[in-house]
C-alpha cells in the first residue's frame, strides 16, 4: 500500500502543487517589508543612534567635564581633556568619541549628571572613511544643535523611566 501511495504522490506531484498553493497564498497578502529609503519604520523614543553634545538655552555647552562618561564606557571609546576656566568651573577642551569602538550601550548617557551627552535619533550616518567616524567636540556639538528639538522631546517622553 505504501508503494501505491508513493507512486500516486509522485505521479500527481502533490508536493509541488501544495508548495505552489502556499506561494499563491502569500503572493496576494500584504507585504511585510517596507521600501526603505522612501518609507521608514517608527523609531522608539529610547532608540540609541548618533551621539550628540547638548547646549543650554543660552548657548553654553552642558558638559561639566566630570569624565563619568569616559569612566563608564566599556569600549573605551570616549576621550576627554578639560581645563578650569576663569570663573572656577571646568569645561572640556577635547571631547572625542571613536564611533568605530562604540557599542551604543547608552551608559555614557545614563552616567551624565547634566544630560550633556545623548544618543540622538539619527541612524543614517554612514561614512566613506574610518577617519570620519572619529567624532570631535565640534561635530558632537553640531549634532546636538541639529537634533536638539527631537532630543529634548525624546528625553521628556523617557523622563518617567529614568
Curated annotation (Swiss-Prot):
Reaction(s) catalysed by this chain's protein: a quinone + NADH + 5 H(+)(in) = a quinol + NAD(+) + 4 H(+)(out)
Compartment annotation: Cell inner membrane
Species of provenance: Granulibacter bethesdensis (strain ATCC BAA-1260 / CGDNIH1)
Source species, domain of life: Bacteria
Record's function text: NDH-1 shuttles electrons from NADH, via FMN and iron-sulfur (Fe-S) centers, to quinones in the respiratory chain. The immediate electron acceptor for the enzyme in this species is believed to be ubiquinone. Couples the redox reaction to proton translocation (for every two electrons transferred, four hydrogen ions are translocated across the cytoplasmic membrane), and thus conserves the redox energy in a proton gradient.
Comment on bound cofactor: Binds 2 [4Fe-4S] clusters per subunit.
BP-aspect Gene Ontology terms: aerobic respiration
EC number: 7.1.1.-
Protein name: NADH-quinone oxidoreductase subunit I
Signal peptide: none
The UniProt record lists the keyword ATP-binding: no
